[in-house]
């Protein structure tokens, strides 16, 4: 069956922003109780060490996604952008991102692209927060890992969506 390509770019700056926002809100919630130490450890900051650790967690999440979605992803030699373009640059920049190039049948439902894009982003954010909390707030880490893993079946389902063939059109 004929194939087509879809590309989804996940921006690193947006990932860092969402991670910072979610961890800030979690620390504020913890602070409303008597958990001041947990609140201080829960939030991320802009220190080089913190960004470096989060960046490594983001890389791990992207690598896991590539393994899970491998049957849809082009080989590395065919799609140049699929390689880790951030390999040696730890600094957070808005322009840089991870490009997922998927090979899908022509009858793939393009209505699923927004959901897939959002789910990939959410998976990476939840996985990175889970990794962060594994070091700073172990009680919360498993909840974020579960949220990340819970997105995978939904991503698989969205990747399997197809449109019906109509008479007079080619596949």
PLM segments and residue spans:
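Short conserved catalytic/interaction loops centered on acidic-Pro-aromatic/His motifs
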Residues: 137-147
């Amino acid at each position: 069956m004929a194939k087509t390509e879809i590309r989804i770019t996940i921006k690193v700056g947006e990932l860092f922003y969402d991670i910072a926002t979610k961890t800030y809100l979690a620390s504020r919630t913890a602070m409303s109780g008597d958990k001041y130490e947990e609140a201080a450890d829960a939030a991320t900051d802009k220190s080089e060490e913190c960004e470096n650790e989060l960046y490594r967690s983001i890389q791990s999440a992207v690598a896991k996604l590539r393994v899970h979605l491998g049957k849809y992803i082009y080989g590395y030699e065919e799609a140049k952008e699929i390689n880790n373009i951030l390999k040696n640059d730890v600094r957070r920049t808005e322009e840089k991102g991870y490009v997922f190039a998927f090979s899908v049948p022509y009858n793939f439902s393009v209505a699923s692209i927004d959901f897939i894009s959002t789910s990939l982003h959410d998976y990476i954010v939840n996985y990175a927060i889970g990794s962060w909390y594994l070091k700073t707030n172990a009680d919360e880490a498993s909840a974020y890992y579960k949220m990340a893993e819970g997105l995978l079946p939904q991503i698989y389902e969205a990747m399997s969506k197809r449109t019906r063939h109509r008479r007079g059109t080619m596949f």
